Regions:
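Acidic, glycine/proline-rich low-complexity segments that act as flexible tails and inter-domain linkers
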Residues: 1-49, 75
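Short acidic/histidine-centered micro-motifs embedded in hydrophobic/aromatic stretches
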Residues: 35, 55, 87-91
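Alpha-helical scaffolds flanking conserved acidic
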Residues: 47-52, 81-87
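Short, thiol/selenol-centered motifs that function as redox-active sites or metal-ligating centers
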Residues: 53, 57-69
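C-terminal structural segments of small proteins and small subunits
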Residues: 85-99
Length: 99
């Protein structure tokens, strides 16, 4: 299987798999959706900040599917190229540090 070339391609494939799971595992997928909503709701940190944190964690943990979905959300939230670059610098540092 070829690697996805864009976050849209990646998220499309995963979304198809998640739709199938919603049919066969509705309780699990409902719980996952509730967890995602609780973890990204407005609080002391705004939605964009929470998504930037989530993307940094996804990058450091090398979760391609997670990266795709968080990039997709951040694009919708108006994240600038400079913000993405700053986040990438920090994520690379945290994921590839000396310890």
């Amino acid at each position: 299987m070829a690697l996805p070339q864009s976050y849209r391609e990646l998220t499309g494939e995963v979304a198809t798999q998640m739709r199938a799971l919603r049919k066969t595992q509705p309780d699990l997928m409902s719980a996952f959706a509730a967890l995602a909503a609780a973890g990204t709701k407005e609080g002391a940190l705004g939605e964009k900040t929470r998504e930037l944190v989530a993307l940094g964690i996804a990058i450091a943990s090398r979760c391609d599917d997670c990266i795709g979905f968080h990039v997709q959300t951040l694009v919708k939230l108006g994240t600038t190229r400079e913000e993405f670059e700053d986040l990438l610098a920090t994520a690379v540092y945290m994921g590839g540090g000396p310890l």
